[in-house]
């Protein structure tokens, strides 16, 4: 079963129109959001951490080694639950020093060294460009699967898809993200749109997980019972966990939640009130746990039925 390119384009345009409308509303709103609503919006916006890699990379990685994807989710959960004071202190320093980026933050810790800020900014640029390319590859992969093309299909269609997505994202960033660099003026529209997108992603995660669990099987018991007997998954239950690698990757993920440029911006720069972290330290870990549950159900269910997975990179 495949969908027409026209239908996919129409749905994508409609979704982007909704995102633009939400961001526009957030920017033009004359009064601030109520404190409780603001805290929920901020908490959900932290799920910008979950990108297209969550859909494809984590599932592909888990298909190769079932629990190898866990550090990506476990690191942020451990940091927020057991050391939320780290983020609280970063937010306070950011507000005191009028910080607008991770480069400014690190430079501020060393006497506001401009040369250090430039070096950090260049490192972020070099690191982020391949990462953005990977996200675009994930989007193209999704489109290819929907239209019935091969997962690794290339050519004009794939190039056009990546180009169009890049232009739309650039336009959104220019309109709602880079109009000012004053740390006292928050991008309320952009954060509201990110929070909405986080809800959409969570709904998609749960919908796929529910379809696999209750559509292909008769619930969790049936899913895991059949998985235990499936020849394709026999090696999963015999694999040994590489604990040193798991610990190192979890530590890297803990740092990623505060060092990734987009994550730093949303978590630290866009924080309006530090007390919003009190809710975020529970909401965001719960979000990641639900996303991880989706990964496990999707991998076990789909591999058991058809033995097919998406590539991990």
What residue ranges belong to the model's regions?
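Membrane-interface "cap" regions at the ends of multi-pass membrane proteins
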Residues: 1-57, 164-190, 196, 202
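Hydrophobic alpha-helical transmembrane segments
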Residues: 14-31, 65-72, 109, 195, ...
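Helix-loop-helix module between adjacent transmembrane segments
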Residues: 19, 71-179, 183, 248-256, ...
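Helix-loop-helix junctions that connect adjacent transmembrane segments
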Residues: 147-161, 213-253
